[in-house]
Amino acid sequence: MKLSLCNEVLRHLSFPRQCAFAAAVGYDALEIAPFTLGTDPRRLTPRRIAAVRGALAAEGLVCSSLHWLLVAPQGLSITSADASVRRTTVDLMCRLCDLAADLGAEVLVHGSPVQRQLPGGAAARQDAARQRAAACLATAADAAHAAGVTYCIEPLAMRETNFINTV
């Protein structure tokens, strides 16, 4: 069995120090939350990505996956009625598929409860939001396939989100 640590619990440390700590206490990998690498993961440079890979390798770790995908930048949503918000969100989702591949991860775990929340009100509004989310996830699935990674949706408790609580 291999153990992976969600790196946001150590986000107060530099990434190399996160790696050193994880290795020292027996972890084999980090599950990286992209927001911990920069305020806008779309702007990570090849040099920064190489530095992340290097920090992992220096401690004998790998990147097991990416998670908490849509924390940054602010305002992302797969259910929003605003097409520009969804375009920005889908662009990030697709870029994160490439980032996962660049870091050697095989999996992206879509939790991000706030960014998938269904609107209140009429059932028709909620159905439309579900359809918008399905379209966003389908585009991310295509990008994941092209990058050679798997894009997963994480069912979350109803206290966290009202959308996708079971699979």
Q: PLM features: what roles do these ranges have?
A:
Residues 11-16:
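Short N-terminal binding/cap micro-motifs at the start of the first secondary-structure element
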Residues 33-57, 112-119:
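Glycine-rich, proline-tolerant flexible connector loops at the mouths of alpha/beta enzymes
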Residues 17, 21-27, 34-41:
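Conserved N-terminal beta1-alpha1 strand-loop-helix module at the mouth
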Residues 1-4, 9, 62:
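Mobile, glycine- and charge-enriched loop segments
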Residues 5, 22, 30, 56, ...:
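Conserved, mostly hydrophobic/aromatic
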Residues 17, 75-167:
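Active-site acidic/histidine proton-transfer and metal-coordination neighborhood
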Residues 6-10, 33-37, 68-71, 113, ...:
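Active-site beta-loop-alpha junctions enriched in small/polar residues
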Residues 19-25, 44-67, 97-104, 138-146:
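Acidic (Asp/Glu)-rich catalytic clusters
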